[in-house]
């Protein structure tokens, strides 16, 4: 059964915001206040379709019809650990209804959201524009994620998508794009810097594109020789395969590590210039790493992390991507039980070229 628009509004919004009648005809959260979601099965290898109830909107909330959702490697890890969880945090959707205090988006807008669900908005990090570091932040894993056809989200943590960027490309930018751009922006990387990118996957291929557009000399570093041509096509000036003897004379000011597995850390430490910085972006498969101590000491090297990005930086990222025509390479699958299973299998086996999007 499909409810009329007026019924949907009264069901999910305590005080519905009036919308233009012509606009209403283009909006469609079907069968609200229930919606369809795809929950992880045992081991994250399968998915189960389920019906959930949309919560009532708070004053800052928006009800969103989901258009598509990218699949991050982090999603596969959560799906494997938490049976029944609805994962997905690279979400693109269309605003259907909004709470009375929502001012930053309008009904009908295409928006992106997903990794950060909320923060306290009161601590030193929130007040200084670094809310991604808020100790009370909640993330996609604290509720229902984007493998669904609808969602309710705090409008203060959504982003308007530039019209130049298609939804299927915008999804991966909300996390993968934000993560690599956040490192470039947050660590004040100069356009004259030489930047190495470790790993040529979802984050890595975007890191190459963003760093090249940033003006940097870009060195792609991968264990897979077959990815050399792709890396050069994406904008790398040089390619290093770690399975071969390292013969390059190039030293790097920064290395962006997007890889999720164990790595030959001694190789990367020795590729850094004096005072160089290794920035870790991916969720590690192991809880700790071993860094060669003496080279790090005598060359004053830094090993740091970078966690996605603040709202301000995410908006900057979308502006930059639109201006420089930066788009992820995507494989598209239907957002169905079968499509979720196939898409997640591609990501888990690290075969995706280069980001899976469910729509």
Q: What are the functions of these language-model segments?
A:
Residues 2-33, 311-359:
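C-terminal hydrophobic helical "lid"/dimerization subdomain
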Residues 53-69, 78-124, 157, 162-165:
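Glycine-rich beta-strand-centered segment in the early N-terminal region that forms part
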Residues 78, 118-198:
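NAD(P)H dinucleotide-binding glycine-rich loop of Rossmann-like/cofactor-binding domains
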Residues 96, 219, 279:
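Conserved beta-strand positions in the Rossmann-like core of class I SAM-dependent methyltransferases
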Residues 191-200, 212-267:
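Adenosine-nucleotide cofactor-binding segment
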Residues 204-205:
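N-terminal Rossmann-fold NAD(P) dinucleotide-binding loop
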Residues 262-329, 334-337:
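Glycine-rich phosphate-binding loop and adjacent beta-alpha segment
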């Amino acid at each position: 059964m499909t409810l009329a628009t007026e019924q949907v509004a009264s069901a999910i919004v305590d005080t519905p915001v009036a919308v233009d009648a012509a606009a209403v005809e283009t909006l469609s959260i079907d069968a609200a206040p229930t919606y369809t979601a795809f929950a992880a099965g045992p081991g994250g290898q399968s998915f189960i379709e389920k019906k959930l109830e949309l919560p009532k909107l708070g004053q800052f909330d928006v009800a969103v019809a989901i258009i598509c959702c990218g699949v991050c490697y982090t999603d596969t890890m959560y799906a494997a650990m938490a049976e029944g969880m609805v994962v997905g945090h690279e979400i693109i959707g269309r605003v259907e209804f909004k709470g009375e205090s929502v001012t930053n988006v309008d009904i009908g807008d295409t928006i992106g959201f997903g990794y950060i669900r909320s923060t306290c908005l009161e601590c030193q990090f929130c007040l200084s524009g670094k809310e991604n570091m808020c100790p009370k932040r909640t993330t996609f894993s604290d509720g229902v994620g984007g493998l669904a056809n609808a969602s309710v989200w705090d409008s203060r943590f959504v982003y308007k998508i530039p019209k130049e960027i298609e939804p299927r490309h915008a999804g991966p930018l909300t996390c993968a794009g934000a993560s690599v751009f956040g490192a470039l922006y947050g660590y004040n990387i100069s356009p004259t810097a030489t930047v190495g990118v470790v790993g040529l996957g979802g984050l890595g291929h975007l890191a190459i594109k963003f760093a090249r557009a940033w003006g940097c000399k870009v060195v792609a570093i991968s264990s897979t020789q077959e990815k050399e041509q792709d890396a050069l096509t994406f904008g790398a000036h040089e390619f290093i395969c770690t399975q071969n003897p390292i013969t390059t004379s190039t030293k790097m000011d920064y290395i962006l590590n997007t890889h999720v597995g164990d790595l030959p850390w001694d190789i990367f430490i020795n590729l850094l210039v004096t005072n160089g910085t290794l920035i870790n972006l991916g969720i590690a498969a192991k809880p700790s790493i071993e860094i060669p101590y003496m080279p790090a000491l005598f060359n004053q090297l830094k090993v740091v992390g970078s966690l996605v990005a603040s709202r301000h930086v995410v908006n900057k990222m979308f502006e930059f991507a639109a201006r420089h025509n930066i788009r992820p390479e995507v494989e598209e699958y239907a957002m169905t039980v079968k499509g979720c299973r196939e898409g997640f299998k591609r990501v888990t086996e690290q075969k995706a070229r280069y980001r899976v999007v469910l729509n």
